[in-house]
A protein has these predicted regions:
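Gly-rich Lys/Arg/Thr-decorated short loops/hinges at beta-loop-alpha junctions or inter-strand turns
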Residues: 32-40, 100-111, 223, 264
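Short, amphipathic alpha-helical interaction segments embedded in low-complexity terminal/linker regions
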Residues: 210, 215-300
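A short, well-structured juxtamembrane/interface segment
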Residues: 46-61
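Glycine-rich phosphate-binding loops that contact phosphosugars or nucleotide phosphates
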Residues: 69-206, 215-217
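Cofactor-/ligand-binding subdomain signature composed of acidic, glycine-rich
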Residues: 1-43, 47
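Active-site pocket-shaping loop/turn-to-helix segments
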Residues: 42, 49, 111-112, 200, ...
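Aromatic/hydrophobic pocket-lining residues that form π-stacking "cages" and hydrophobic walls in ligand
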Residues: 57, 153, 211
Length: 300
C-alpha cells in the first residue's frame, strides 16, 4: 500500500519552536504546549465547510436507517471509541447508530497491539462483520493519512457504496484517495516530533465532537441546547433530566417530577404534557403524529 514520504508529512516535521525542549523548565514546556494548542481550534475552523458536508451526509444516512462507523488505529481509534461510546447516553440513540472500529480490537483500547494498524486484511474483515451497507457512513481517522488499516477500510467502504470521510493532518496523503469528503486539519509539527497524540489528536477530538454533536442536533435529539433524549441510567442523570424538564417547561421541580413519573420518565412526553397542558396519553399521541419531531408535537 502506498505511503507518503516522511519529508512530505507535516506530522513528521520537527517543530522549530521546541528545538531545545529537553532543556526547558516545567512551566516553559507547558506554556509552549499551550501556545501550540491554541492553533488547533483555528485550524479546525478552516475545515468547517468539509465538516458540514460530512455532518449532512451522516444525518441523511441515519435518517435512512444507516450508521456512522468510525475507523482508526492507536490514538485515533481510541478517540473514535470514546466519541461513539458517548452517543447513547448523551442523545438516547442505539449503540448501533454510532460505532467505532479500532485496529487490534478491544485490547487496543487500553494498550498497544503491535502491528495491528498495518493489517489491511483485518479492516475488511471487521467491516464485513458489521455488515456494511450503502446507507452507512465510514469515517477513517489517521493523522498521517497512511495507516493501512484505515486506508483499507475506506477503500472497501467505497466499493460497497457507503459514504466515505477522511480525517487527517496531511491533505496529500493516500487517505484522500478513497474519501469522498476530506477533513484535513493542518495543525503543523508537534512539539515532540511525530507524536500525533498531541495537536493532531486534539484536532481529531474536536472534529469528532462536531460530527456527532451537530448530526444529533440536526436529527432532533436536542431541544434548544438541552439533552432531551438523555439516558436516565443513574441518579445523577435522573436529576439532570429533572433539571432539563424544569428549564424547558418553566414548571417547578415538583410538577416536573410528577410529569416525569406519569410519562414513564420519557422527557419528550413529559415536556409535551407540561407545555401543552395534556395528559401522558395525549402527549404520546401528539409525538406519534409528529413522527417524533418534538417541536412539531409542541406546535412550535
Amino acid at each position: 500500500m502506498p505511503s507518503l514520504p516522511q519529508e512530505r508529512r507535516r506530522t513528521e516535521h520537527r517543530n522549530p519552536a521546541s528545538g531545545r525542549l529537553d532543556r526547558l523548565p516545567t512551566k516553559a514546556i507547558l506554556r509552549l504546549m499551550n501556545r501550540e494548542d491554541r492553533k488547533v481550534a483555528f485550524s479546525v475552523g478552516q475545515q468547517i465547510p468539509s465538516i458540514a458536508r460530512a455532518v449532512d451526509a451522516i444525518v441523511s444516512s441515519i435518517r435512512k436507517g444507516g450508521r456512522l462507523i468510525y475507523v482508526g488505529a492507536g490514538s485515533s481509534g481510541r478517540l473514535a471509541v470514546l466519541d461513539a461510546a458517548e452517543c447513547p447516553p448523551t442523545f438516547g440513540v442505539s449503540p448501533n447508530t454510532v460505532q467505532a472500529l479500532i485496529a487490534g480490537g478491544r485490547k487496543a483500547v487500553t494498550g498497544a497491539v503491535e502491528g495491528a494498524e498495518d493489517s489491511a486484511r483485518n479492516a475488511v474483515r471487521d467491516l464485513r462483520a458489521k455488515r456494511l451497507a450503502r446507507n452507512d457512513v465510514v469515517v477513517g481517522i489517521a493523522a498521517s493519512g497512511t495507516t493501512p488499516y484505515v486506508l483499507s477500510a475506506l477503500a472497501f467502504a467505497r466499493k460497497r457504496g457507503a459514504t466515505t470521510v477522511a480525517i487527517t493532518s496531511n491533505r496529500k496523503a493516500p487517505i484522500a484517495r478513497d474519501a469522498q469528503i476530506v477533513i484535513a486539519v493542518d495543525v503543523g509539527p508537534e512539539i515532540v516530533t511525530g507524536s500525533t497524540r498531541l495537536k493532531a489528536g486534539t484536532s481529531q477530538k474536536l472534529v469528532l465532537n462536531m460530527l456527532s454533536t451537530a448530526a444529533m442536533v440536526r436529527l432532533g435529539h436536542v431541544y434548544d441546547n438541552l439533552m432531551i433524549d438523555i439516558a436516565q441510567t443513574n441518579e445523577k442523570l435522573r436529576q439532570r433530566a429533572l433539571r432539563i424538564l424544569t428549564e424547558a417547561s418553566g414548571a417547578d421541580a415538583s410538577t416536573a417530577k410528577h410529569a416525569l413519573r406519569q410519562s414513564g420518565h420519557d422527557l419528550r412526553e413529559a415536556l409535551v404534557m407540561l407545555k401543552n397542558g395534556v395528559d401522558a396519553k395525549a402527549a404520546r399521541a401528539r409525538l406519534i403524529a409528529a413522527k417524533g419531531n418534538l417541536r412539531q408535537a409542541l406546535g412550535e
